[in-house]
Structures are given as structure tokens and as C-alpha cells.
């Protein structure tokens, strides 16, 4: 009897190990499979807490913004590159600083939208935009998480490095800004969200910021570093990232030289939530 029980126990353990091994080998191809004629609506919310010191005084700023954008894929090339017409639907922003609050809401955007070309990795290869967009409209800059465009096993990690240079709005004293990010991604596993079986990808990363500009005849130089942590869900049924959450902490210093020399340290904490729905 004891031998029989031991034999049964060995079989159970063997099946458990085999089952665990099979699950561990499960994989998915992580890339965007854009379809011509498909339309998606993106909602992005950002909560930003800023602490800035200047001339011995500390100033705290809290900003909340919500943007809604819509993108319609009008053309998909044989290699997978897709052209999308991106339209900003609405943006609302609320800022609190020095005991005062300011609200800004806008929904009367141009209907012709912005033409963007995305690769299967989610990278924007071409962007034809309107240079008259205001600073509040720049909040809705639509970007996708970059995917490795290959088969990834659950538990597997991969690295990604991005360098983005932005030409800032004319109202911003910083003329341009370059951001370098290094991220490590992990295919964490499967989860059920809103009745859908999704793949969860978690990530951590570091970033470096440099920029320069002019104001009132003085030169401005900006440097900063930060850390990010977050996750997003990939829906294999439509090959799109449909939800994400991220938190970032960034410390920057703006150095002013010219008629007056000073340094302005600033720390930021930003939480971003994104949802993408097919319409």
C-alpha cells in the first residue's frame, strides 16, 4: 500500500513539473498587427507633482490632465507599416500653484488630424503634424509602447533604448529637449481583465534629459535623470496594447547664464494611465 501511495505521489509530482514546464514555455509574438479601416480611441490621464526651488523659494505645482484622441488606420503596407490619421478629440487640464487654480478645456480641434506612420514595433517612422498646436495639445502626443517584434516566452526579458528629441512650443523657454530612456521589459504572464485574456508586460527603466533655450537674452541649459516603473497589457486578439500604468520620478536642474546666473532645481512625480478601445 505504501509503495502504491508513493508511486501515485511521484506521478502527481511528475505531472505538476511537466505542467509547470509547459506553462513556462508558453510564448506570444509581441508586435502590432495593424488593420486597414480599424479605428481606436485612446484616453490618457496624467497626474504631475512638481517641486521647484528658485532664489531660495520653493514652489509646488500639481497638474492633472486628461486627453482623448482617435486614430484611424487608412493604409497598411505589405511589410506591416501602417498610416494612421490621428485626431485630438478633447483635452482638459487643471493646475494648482501658489494658492491659485487654473483650468483649461478644449475640444474644438481641427478635424483633418495628424498623419502618422507606425512600424510593427510601434515606432513612429513618419509624422506630419501641425506646428500651430498649443502646449495643451502637445499633452495628447500619441505614442505606442515599443514591442520586440518576435516571439517571447513568459518570464523572458528584453531591453530597449530610445532617444527622442522634441522641438518645444514657441511659448516654452526651452527650445528643444532630448530624452534618452533605457528600459528592461519582462513578459510577466497572462491575466484576465474585463473578461479578456491578456499578456502582462512589466518594465523598469532609467532616463536622462538634456535641453537648452533662451529667455530675455539669457541662456538656459537643462539636465536631469529619472526612473520609471510600470506595466501594460497586450491583447493577442487584435495585437494592440490596450491598457498601461506607469510612474516616473525625475530630478532636473535648469542653469541660467547671462545677465543673471542661477540654478533652478526641480523634482517631478508623474503617474500616467492609458486605455485604448476599438470603436
Which residues fall in each region the model found?
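Signature of exported/secreted
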Residues: 24-279
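Bacterial N-terminal signal peptides that target proteins for export
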Residues: 1-11
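Bacterial N-terminal signal peptides
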Residues: 10-19
